[in-house]
Amino acid sequence: MSQFKRVEDGIFIAPQPTEQDIQEAKQQGIRTVIDFRLSSETATSNETLTKNHGLAYVNIPVNKAALSASQISDLDAAMKGKEGPFLLHCETGARVALLLSLSKAKQHDWTTEQVFAEAKRMGFDLKSSPEFSAFVMRTID
């Protein structure tokens, strides 16, 4: 899984996967793919491709300009309601890092700095995005 980054047991993050990546994910034991892309970002959904490979598929559309706490709850519900291991992706992985870090913050009562540090550990600087940074500040108060 060259482009898949293991961020903790049973959770991998990635940019937009190809069909070959989905095949590899299945071979590596991934059971559920959670896609954070908007329908406007791609000509086709990963849903059919993912299901054709026998994996569960969940779409949580995340618009950088319209971030909401409900998206964190949707991620939590998807991970509780489906079987892992999980592959979480968007176009680059940044929205994944944002929501996954905020989900963990909710579980562990983290500060904003801990959220930023967790996303950085995943390879993303949320502070470099005004929208992401503001959302973290609004969510962790």
Enumerate the predicted regions with their spans:
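Cys-dependent protein tyrosine phosphatase-like superfamily
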Residues: M1-F86, S101-D141
